[in-house]
Amino acid sequence: MTTEQARGQQGPNLAIGRQKPPAGVVTPKSDAEEPPLTRKRSKKERGLRGSRKRTGSSGEQTGPEAPGSSNNPPSTGEGPAGAPPASPGPASSRQSHRHRPDSLHDAAQRTYGPLLNRVFGKDRELGPEELDELQAAFEEFDTDRDGYISHRELGDCMRTLGYMPTEMELLEVSQHIKMRMGGRVDFEEFVELIGPKLREETAHMLGVRELRIAFREFDRDRDGRITVAELREAVPALLGEPLAGPELDEMLREVDLNGDGTVDFDEFVMMLSRH
């Protein structure tokens, strides 16, 4: 068979294979010819897929919250936000202090009360210098020298002595003088009326000498310092009964500013002013 004859036999077949199908007829394509269908992922899905890759090895669940999970920590019974249980407030502390006796203050009162009353208190006798001071003030306001001053002059006389009465105190004294003393007082009545108030108000001005005397009562060896042993010796004489050693030690530590275990005169004055 010649070449031309062979081409003539194949020609119709090749032509038939290249013919287009009639209009309206769909010819199925093979799987090899049709590319696989793909859908473009959204940004949200790509982010979710990347998150799964990062956490997939640890087994943690991403995306929506896992069941039972919460941003708040589990409750521990300690109050809001894990705060520790409330401790007893200051009210309970104040209550304990209110019911607890102030042993230091009580000991100071028992120790120094009788001495201070004798040195500064209402029950002590006025000294000659104080009587002279009262006499001078009385005579200053007894302008007619009849031995009396009126209730109107009493306030100014008291201020001259350093005592600063309130208006209510002056009113009470004036009414007392007008009702019981005929509106005026002599010197003895003046001392009886003003003496106790004057002693209370002016003790810090008149009492330096008396404080020295009181300090010497404690300072038995006259070394200018008071020791615990000297306090223990002095207290029975002042109180008629001994004071417990720990109470004395506590009072001494309170005022012992330089920490030498003794009390000098300045510390002694501070101790008396506190109690």
UniProtKB/Swiss-Prot annotation:
**Cellular component, GO, one term:** synapse
Keyword check for Protease, yes or no. Answer: no
Post-translational modification, as annotated: Phosphorylated. Phosphorylation levels change with the light conditions and regulate the activity.
Tell me a Gene Ontology molecular-function term this record carries.
calcium channel regulator activity
User: What compartments host this protein?
Assistant: Cytoplasm; Presynapse
**Top-rank taxon, per record:** Eukaryota
Q: How does it assemble?
A: Interacts with CACNA1F and CACNA1D (via IQ domain) in a calcium independent manner. Interacts (via N-terminus) with UNC119.
Protein name listed in UniProt: Calcium-binding protein 4
Transmembrane domains' residue ranges: none
SMART domains this protein is in?
EFh
Binding annotation for Ca(2+) 1? 142, 144, 146, 148, 153
According to the UniProt entry, which residues carry Phosphoserine? 42
Q: Which GO terms describe its biological process?
A: photoreceptor cell morphogenesis; phototransduction; retinal bipolar neuron differentiation; retinal cone cell development; signal transduction; visual perception
Question: What ranges does the record list as Polar residues composition bias?
Answer: 1-12
**One matching Pfam family:** EF-hand_7
- Give the UniProt tissue specificity note: Expressed in retina and in the inner hair cells (IHC) of the cochlea.
